[in-house]
Amino acid sequence: MIIFIIILALVLCFNVGVYAAYALAATEVSYTKKDGTTVSVKDALDELNKKVPTKSIGDEVTVGGEQFYVLEWDNNCDTVNLISKYNLNKAGTAQQDATYGTTGCAFSSKNYWGSSSNINLNDFIGCTETDAIGKAKSYGRSKGAISSRLLSYEEVDKLETKTNSISIYKMLYGRKPYGEGNYLRFWLGSASRIKNNVWIVAKDYGGIRPVEYYNESNFGVRPVITVLKSKIS
């Protein structure tokens, strides 16, 4: 019995030593930069994060040559959630600073969620590339986003309690209160409790309200994308 305990102790000590060696090696992983200097991976990540200044909700940033608003910011995360400054064009390939009629499209070609109500459709099986959610996802991929979707009803509900902030008001509705320019009208990724209806945002059209999914003249696609902070400028 004593011999067994001694052997077990030796095995445990060996394993701990191996683990410690691997852990130490991991902290010493490094690579050579273009200027010939060597830097550890940890230091490189720290340097990268320092280059991205802290942002607030409603701040404007640029990704891939197009403008976005900061929707969520967490200093402890390497990623950030952004919402496009404008609706996408009808093809869904780029943002377009235009009146709502120019960017309007149907939410989808059919009701693929049935009678389900008050649910988030962003990951609901059934949407196609030509649907509003499909366009948002495709656009996000073109920007190198980790994920992309439409804004949800719950997110808008929370943001509306913060619209005493001019920057958040402008981010959500597309213009300042009593300011010049057009309000944005856009689809949300949430089904309404009314059959065949999906939620939309349009400050000049009653705020947040349900609309038939096949309405193609008034409401556009406004993507929410999740990207690495290193991609913003």
Regions of interest found by a model, annotated:
Residues 51-233:
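Collagenous Gly-X-Y triple-helix signature in extracellular proteins
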Residues 3-51:
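A signal for long, low-complexity, Ser/Thr/Asn-enriched, surface-exposed stalk/shaft
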Residues 2, 13-14, 37, 129, ...:
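Generic alpha-helix initiation/capping and coil-helix boundary signal
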